[in-house]
């Protein structure tokens, strides 16, 4: 195997615009690169712009960046096709597409732009403005037809394709784009190989990576205006979507609009109507998603994707979820109302050496105990919650004892001298001291001890505000900022070692969880545990049976005409170059695919920067693949 030790050379300062870098830095998941080899590095989600369409110039559309997708697709409506060619002028839409496909096959013509242009097909379609609901009419020439294999029918699906410029991270690429309906997906745009090739790499561990240099720092509480109505904002790190207070919500599905009333703290109401983006299914029923115009200050208005609900019983009118936070902000966990200040940029905040954390961390205490950690907007003194603790005295001095699992998986009793005690409500928390590994730094910090809550089962750590001398900033774009991994280039296809087997796999930034081909799946129980036996095999003759504990199940939403799919999830050891991890893998029959495994975000997040078009960057291509 080739050596995996890429030190990425960057141009510029960390938090300036990506195009303006001039310093040389080593890049990690904690301090990421935004470009490499004069190509962008994109997160798994990015803002995409139709800047050549005047009505949509400067309007961001959410795009999913997927190295597993050969083509780029956009959501389009009212798609109609006509032709001025004498042989096809009486046909339209899907009939016209099939006639072109069949004619090209019969005449053995090449599948290229010149061939498709010769059929003189014009495509008319609309893209809906997400803020106004206006249908933007577009006409273009058919330049390609994508043939998509259907999982529910023997007959493939045909999608017309046009060439359009799309802009991400300040770079515009004229890409071949499929027109389709993507209303069932959270992202109206899917960015695939036709955009990424020779233009961008993908870092699956981040969302909105290209937006990070422009992020604003906001407080844990803010006040904004929506259509002249003051709304208080709080932050919810556990929720993906933001939600906003609204009453008298009425959805007009035919007009694709939502009418509702804003309501301030005094109960005064103001009517508003916005385009319906889509319906979101929540635990409390269906909720309409809209782009809410949010005025941050006198000079700046943003549009936040929120679902509408009654929040009259809550102290804030907007709950800010991870998606909107990642697109625009970094949160100061201890401050409030920072939007009123002149300069709230992330770039400026970094100068004071804050502790930057993510919603999900693992910290190491005293070099032997790895504990899940989470941010807090309330706790000042860092807090370790344990199953139980005991106070005692030794030589007249008070000490506290508690049990943690060490790096060898052994339960070990820890005893520390009590420095002081904190009274919080009815509980009294002893305060002790420990050595913490925070990224590449070791710090001796005080922390409090308390019992787990009733619903908690395992010890965890709460990252209080006093963990840093300046401030603790929350960056929701990624995870594990305190356990950084070096960035490395990886091909779309690489040879990985899975347990004792080595074979080529596909690196797919669009997949949340990795997946492996599994036959003869048999689930059973043993000693109270859910177990599974399955056979791995691929099309070059490798075959091996595995037995694993089932650690989870994945429920795949069925398409029309399909049965719901439930896949057992197991843990397997996977190695790519120097990256060696035990990850969760779902079991599915991938027999119809050449590549018997895909590595998704849960492996790639450890520093992989993936190409969509280059293969075998780290590893050698096997002879049987040549």
How would you label these PLM feature ranges?
Residues 1-21:
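Gram-negative bacterial Sec-dependent N-terminal signal peptides
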Residues 22-626:
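Pepsin/retropepsin-fold aspartyl endopeptidases
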């Amino acid at each position: 195997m080739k050596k995996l030790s890429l030190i990425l050379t960057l141009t510029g300062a960390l938090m300036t615009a990506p195009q303006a870098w001039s310093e040389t830095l080593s890049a990690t998941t904690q301090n990421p690169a935004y470009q490499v080899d004069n190509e962008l590095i994109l997160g798994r989600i990015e803002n995409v712009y139709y800047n050549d369409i005047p009505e949509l110039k400067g309007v961001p559309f959410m795009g999913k960046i997927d190295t597993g997708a050969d083509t780029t697709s956009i959501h389009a409506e009212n798609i109609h096709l006509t032709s001025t060619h004498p042989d096809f002028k009486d046909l339209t839409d899907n009939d016209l597409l099939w006639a072109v496909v069949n004619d090209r096959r019969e005449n053995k013509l090449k599948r290229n732009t010149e061939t498709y242009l010769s059929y003189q097909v014009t495509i008319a379609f609309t893209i809906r403005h997400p803020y106004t609901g206006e249908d933007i009419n577009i006409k273009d020439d058919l330049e390609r037809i994508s043939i998509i294999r259907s999982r529910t029918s023997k007959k493939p699906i045909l999608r017309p394709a046009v060439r359009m410029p799309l802009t991400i991270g300040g770079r515009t690429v004229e890409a071949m784009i499929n027109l389709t309906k993507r209303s069932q997906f959270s992202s109206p745009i899917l960015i695939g190989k036709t955009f990424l090739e020779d233009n961008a790499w993908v870092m699956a561990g981040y969302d909105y990576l290209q937006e990070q240099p422009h992020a604003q720092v906001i407080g844990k509480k803010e006040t904004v205006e929506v259509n002249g109505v003051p709304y208080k904002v709080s932050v919810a790190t556990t929720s993906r979507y933001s939600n906003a207070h609204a009453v008298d919500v009425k959805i007009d599905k035919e007009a694709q609009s939502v009418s509702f009333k804003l309501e301030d703290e005094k109960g005064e109401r103001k009517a508003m109507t916005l385009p319906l983006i889509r319906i979101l299914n929540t635990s409390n029923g269906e909720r309409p998603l809209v782009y809410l115009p949010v005025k941050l200050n006198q000079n700046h208005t943003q549009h936040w994707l929120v679902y509408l609900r009654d929040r009259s019983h809550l102290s804030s009118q907007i709950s800010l979820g991870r998606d909107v936070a990642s697109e625009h902000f970094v949160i100061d966990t201890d401050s409030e109302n920072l939007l009123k200040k002149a300069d709230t940029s992330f770039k400026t905040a970094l100068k004071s050496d804050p502790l930057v954390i993510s919603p999900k961390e693992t910290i190491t205490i005293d070099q032997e105990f790895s504990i899940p950690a989470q941010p807090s907007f309330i706790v000042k003194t860092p807090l370790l919650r344990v199953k139980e603790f005991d106070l005692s005295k030794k030589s007249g001095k008070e000490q506290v004892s508690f049990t943690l699992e060490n790096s060898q998986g052994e339960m070990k009793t820890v005893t520390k001298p009590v420095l002081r005690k904190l009274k919080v409500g009815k509980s009294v928390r002893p305060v002790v001291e420990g050595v913490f590994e925070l990224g590449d730094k070791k710090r001796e910090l005080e922390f409090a001890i308390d019992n787990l809550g009733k619903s908690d089962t395992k010890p965890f750590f709460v990252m209080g505000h006093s963990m840093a001398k300046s401030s603790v900033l929350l960056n929701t774009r990624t995870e594990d900022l305190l356990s950084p991994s070096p960035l490395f280039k990886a091909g779309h296809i690489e040879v990985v070692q899975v347990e004792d087997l080595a074979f080529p796999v596909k690196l797919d930034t669009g997949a949340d969880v990795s997946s492996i081909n599994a036959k003869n799946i048999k689930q059973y129980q043993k000693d109270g545990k859910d177990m599974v036996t399955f056979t791995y095999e691929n099309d070059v003759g490798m075959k091996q049976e595995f037995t694993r504990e089932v650690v989870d199940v994945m429920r795949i939403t069925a398409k029309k005409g399909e049965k719901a799919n439930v896949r057992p999830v197991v843990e397997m050891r996977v190695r790519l170059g120097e990256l060696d991890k035990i990850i969760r893998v779902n079991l599915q029959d991938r027999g119809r695919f050449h590549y018997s495994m895909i590595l998704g975000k849960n492996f790639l997040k450890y520093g992989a920067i993936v190409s969509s078009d280059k293969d075998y960057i780290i590893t050698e291509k096997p002879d049987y693949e040549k």
